[in-house]
């Protein structure tokens, strides 16, 4: 089974998207959008910029990159000690976040999977999900 985008709409009409792997693991999760059109637009943006470079200011991945221009992925260590990445759009706003991973290598594996699958994954919709 291949990766897919899921648009999840709540009963109030807000929605967000998730890019899920073939094993149904989250690869990217977008923020709340007020309309379905905005959510679809966010998926279109993620498809376009999925090959963006990785910014790692603190050198968690082995080599610090310094600050990069948008669009980009930003590698981060969460206050909980777990690692994640976020996808930033050309306008400088965060578009989506990756899963919280226990190790740097797990986060880099999730990033590689997101880059590989984001461009061509099909889209499905769910109503009433969380």
Residue ranges and their predicted role:
Residues 8, 14-22, 27-33, 42-45, ...:
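A structural feature that tracks compact, well-ordered secondary-structure segments
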């Amino acid at each position: 089974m291949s990766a897919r985008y899921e648009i999840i709409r709540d009963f109030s009409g807000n929605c967000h998207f998730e890019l899920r792997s073939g094993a149904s693991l989250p690869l990217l999760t977008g923020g709340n959008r007020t309309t379905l059109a905005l959510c679809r637009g966010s998926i279109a943006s993620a498809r376009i910029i999925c090959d963006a470079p990785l910014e790692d200011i603190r050198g968690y991945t082995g080599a610090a990159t310094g600050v990069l221009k948008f669009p980009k992925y930003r590698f981060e260590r969460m206050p909980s000690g777990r690692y994640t990445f976020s996808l930033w759009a050309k306008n400088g706003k965060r578009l989506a976040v990756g899963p919280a991973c226990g190790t740097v290598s797990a986060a880099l594996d999730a990033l590689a999977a997101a880059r590989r699958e984001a461009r061509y994954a099909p889209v499905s919709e769910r109503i009433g999900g969380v």
